[in-house]
Amino acid sequence: MPAVIAAFLCPLFHAVSNIIDAHLSNNVFRKLPTLIFYNCLTNFFAAPMVLVFGLPQWYGWEIMPLLALVGMIDVFYQIPYYEALRRGDTSVVVAWFSLGYVLVPVLAYLMVDEKLSFVQYAGFGIIIAASVVLNIENPRKIKINKAFYLMLLSSLLLSLQAVLYKYALEKIDWISAVFYSALFSTLTVFGFLMPRIVRLNIKANFPRYKTKFYVFGLNEFVNQVGTVASIFAMSLLPVVAVESINSTQPLFVLGIGAALYALFGNRFKEDVSTVHLLRKSICFVFITAGVFMVL
C-alpha cells in the first residue's frame, strides 16, 4: 500500500509543479530566456540536496560529454515546453508529455531495429488520436494547435535525455550523474548571458525573481518530492505500473486547475467549461490507456 500511495504522489506533486510552471510562464516573466535562467538557477541551488545521499565521484573525462548533453537538454527542452504553456491549457500540454512514451519505442525501432508488438502500435495510435481530439476547437475545421508541435519537440528531447541518462547510469552512480548534469545545466544557462539584450532583461528582472523566489522554491520542492516518490515506488512496484500511474498526471492537473479556477479565476491557463472538462477527461483516460499499452 505505501508503494501505491507513493506512485500516485508522483503525478500529484508533478501536477502542482506544472501548474506553477504555467503561472510563471503566463503571469511572471514575459521573456522565456529570463524565466529559464532563473528556473535553472533555482534548480542549481537545490542540487546540493543530493549530497545528503553521498558525494559525487570523478569517473574521468570520457563520460563528461554525455553528461554535458544531458545537462544541455535539461535546459533547452524548457523552451518549447514553456511556449506551449502559453498557447494551450495546462492539462492538455501536460498530456502531450505522453508523446515521449511513444517516441522511446519508435526511436528504439529506428536506431536498433527493435520490433514493436501489435499492442504497442495500437497504444501509439490511441495516444495520437486522443492528442488530435484535444486540439479540435471547431469540429468542422480541424486545426492542430502549435502547442502540440512544441510538446512533440519537448518530448523528443526528453526521450533522448532519458536514453542518455540510462546509458550514463550503466557507467556511473546516480549521485554523480545528477550532480554533474546539474552542473552542466547551470553552465549552459549562463550562456544566456552572452547576448546583451537577454543579459539586460535578466538583470532587470532580478528584483522580480527575488520577490518570487518562494514560488520558484516551492516549484522545486514539489517537483523533487514527486521525483523521490516515483523512485521509491519503482523500488517496490513494476516499472510499467509506476509509469502507467504517472500517465494520470493530466487528470490531476485538470482537477487542481478546476479548483484553482473556482478560487482565483483563469490565472493558471485552464478552460474548465463543462464541454471542455468532459472532452479532456475522456481524452486523458484514453491517453493513459495508450501509455499502458505502449509500455
Regions found by a protein language model. Name each.
Residues 1-4, 52-62, 107-119, 166-176, ...:
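Helix-coil boundary and interhelical linker segments in multi-pass alpha-helical membrane proteins
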Residues 9, 37-38, 96-99, 119-122, ...:
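Hydrophobic core positions of alpha-helical segments in small-molecule transporters
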Residues 27-34, 80-96, 115, 170-177, ...:
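Structural motif at transmembrane-helix junctions in multi-pass transporters
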Residues 40-44, 98-102, 124-127, 131, ...:
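Residue-level recognition of pore/gate-forming positions within transmembrane alpha-helices
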Residues 81, 100-122, 132, 236, ...:
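C-terminal transmembrane-helix exit sites in multi-pass transporters
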Residues 146-176:
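Selected transmembrane alpha-helices and immediately adjacent juxtamembrane segments
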